[in-house]
Amino acid sequence: MNCAISGEVPVEPVVSTKSGLLFERRLIERHISDYGKCPVTGEPLTIDDIVPIKTGEIIKPKTLHTASIPGLLGTFQNEWDGLMLSNFALEQQLHTARQELSHALYQHDSACRVIARLKKERDEARQLLAEVERHIPAAPEAVTANAALSNGKRAAVDEELGPDAKKLCPGISAEIITELTDCNAALSQKRKKRQIPQTLASIDTLERFTQLSSHPLHKTNKPGICSMDILHSKDVIATGGVDATAVLFDRPSGQILSTLTGHSKKVTSVKFVGDSDLVLTASADKTVRIWRNPGDGNYACGYTLNDHSAEVRAVTVHPTNKYFVSASLDGTWCFYDLSSGSCLAQVSDDSKNVDYTAAAFHPDGLILGTGTSQSVVKIWDVKSQANVAKFDGHTGEVTAISFSENGYFLATAAEDGVRLWDLRKLRNFKSFLSADANSVEFDPSGSYLGIAASDIKVYQTASVKAEWNLIKTLPDLSGTGKATCVKFGSDAQYVAVGSMDRNLRIFGLPGDEKANVDDDSAQDS
């Protein structure tokens, strides 16, 4: 007799008085308490309707299939088979769960990467939108391209102003970027074939350098030369002075060719544009001027650029001689088109309180180096205007930057001296410690390095691991104890030094005194 619910032989058998069915006591009592009816017939059923079936108390009844050893073995075999099947099913489920978990983890990782990328793109888009909104003109005006006033200033209608009253720059176009890239490729290829010119002054020659001449080029009431550049093809030296003028000096004849007046404060930087008759000057009056020689020797201001809001410390010309960059204490550097005098891009750093004090193009033109008053040297990708590297280590304001013609070395000057950087590994590999290094300059061949501080030192360049030998120490004869700038002449045949006593001094080999003329021929006031 088996239970009508479980199908097993009941331990405590009971029978329904209504249906006559046999049940296990505990099962039928629970069913009645839950449902109140017979589980088989569905008729109403109570506890009183079930009657226990009594068996002998001494011998318990046994089921037929467990009453013999073969029956027990069969039961055990069935139990074992069920256990194995259940274990196999569990292992299958575990394997499937592991695969699903691995897939879910990969999906989670991919989702995190996508979310991070989307957040970055969102932030960049927001920043770009904010920049565009700042430059959207409040009242659009007609723009006349390349218009200039008779005094050299650009016409007001040339400038589209944003809400913050800053000029909206069009950006560096794809055509210009292609031009810069082509120039870089050509110069890089040319550098691989470059050889040191045989006419380059030897080390023995430099060791015998002495002062050949001295020329007072600027006014006595505001003495001092702040910057200098040399047009090697014509042997003309340009100096920028504290007296707010720039002087063009012909070294072979010892004569002043022209005096450029127009700035209201000291001229902080002066540059020739290739072999052309263009000269750039930057000033503490927050402007940059482009000077042109119409052919009569009298330079006139072609453009006055006032895109900066603080003192302009440096100008540097791109190797194409079509573009240039100015760097200012307002924390920006500007990329200009020389032909139109228009600012194509004005770049600021993401970090706050950055003042640019020096700037120079890499010889290939796609890298720009800038120095700051916060002792940091920053390297920029000109195409994207992105800061790609920075060099820390100086103490005090970075006063000068010079790239070597080999394309690998960068020299920087600051209050703690001069440091040399390897652009391939982005590290400082040598330092020349001296107080208040005002200027540092590689010669055009990259063979020599000049440093202007309390005196003028000339070093022979070498590799990263080799020793850079000191060739010559030239005294600062100004009496001010401050040589402000140093430049090498063509093939390093002479060294030009500017000082705060307004004198331009020429150091060279005795007997080669091309410019040893009377100081009376120069401007005294």
UniProtKB/Swiss-Prot annotation:
What SMART domains does UniProt report for this protein, alphabetically? Ubox, WD40
InterPro entries xrefs? Pre-mRNA_splic_Prp19_cc, Prp19, RING-Ubox_PRP19, Ubox_domain, WD40/YVTN_repeat-like_dom_sf, WD40_repeat_dom_sf, WD40_rpt, Znf_RING/FYVE/PHD
Listed A to Z, the keywords are: DNA damage, DNA repair, Immunity, Innate immunity, mRNA processing, mRNA splicing, Nucleus, Plant defense, Repeat, Spliceosome, Transferase, Ubl conjugation pathway, WD repeat
| MF terms in GO | ubiquitin protein ligase activity
* Biological processes annotated in GO: defense response to bacterium; DNA repair; innate immune response; mRNA splicing, via spliceosome; protein K63-linked ubiquitination
Provide the catalytic activity annotation: S-ubiquitinyl-[E2 ubiquitin-conjugating enzyme]-L-cysteine + [acceptor protein]-L-lysine = [E2 ubiquitin-conjugating enzyme]-L-cysteine + N(6)-ubiquitinyl-[acceptor protein]-L-lysine
Describe the subunit structure.
Homotetramer. Component of the multiprotein assembly MOS4-associated complex (MAC) at least composed of MOS4, CDC5, PRL1 and PRP19 which is related to the PRP19C/Prp19 complex/NTC/Nineteen complex identified in other organisms. Associated with the spliceosome.
State the protein's purpose: Probable ubiquitin-protein ligase which is mainly involved pre-mRNA splicing and DNA repair. Component of the MAC complex that probably regulates defense responses through transcriptional control and thereby is essential for plant innate immunity.
Q: What is this protein called?
A: Pre-mRNA-processing factor 19 homolog 2
Which organism was this protein described from? Arabidopsis thaliana (Mouse-ear cress)
Q: What is the lineage of its organism?
A: Eukaryota, Viridiplantae, Streptophyta, Embryophyta, Tracheophyta
Q: Which gene encodes it?
A: PRP19B
